[in-house]
């Protein structure tokens, strides 16, 4: 969690991950927190995901779809940065399978400002 202008944002940092193994490990680590939040019945998280300069493949995509299903249950708003090139197509796939609608931003600052806006 990060604090931004007196609001809490659940920041998922997948940036600069260059291997499948490292990405899958990070998804698993962040998954424990998501499960805990879901068990508490929380449904109003502001979520920011950063995948800038990260490597993605089909295996990672499958795990992100699973994570996305939980995020859908615990979030109020979702933002993502680092979406370029083929990642736009992968994001569309994730959104289709999870019914999540991430808003895409160029910078984390833009994303954070959008998340905290009422």
Positions of predicted regions on the chain:
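Amphipathic, Lys/Arg-enriched alpha-helical "gate/interface" segment within cytosolic domains
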Residues: 1-118
């Amino acid at each position: 969690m990060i604090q931004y202008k007196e609001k809490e944002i659940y920041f998922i940092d997948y940036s600069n991950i260059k291997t499948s193994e490292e990405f899958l490990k990070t998804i698993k680590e962040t998954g424990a927190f998501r499960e805990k939040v879901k068990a508490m019945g929380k449904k109003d998280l502001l979520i920011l995901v950063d995948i800038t300069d990260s490597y993605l493949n089909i295996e990672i995509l499958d795990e992100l779809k699973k994570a996305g299903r939980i995020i859908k249950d615990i979030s109020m708003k979702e933002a993502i940065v680092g979406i370029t090139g083929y990642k736009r197509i992968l994001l569309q796939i994730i959104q289709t399978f999870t019914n999540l609608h991430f808003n895409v931003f160029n910078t984390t600052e833009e994303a954070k400002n959008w998340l905290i806006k009422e």
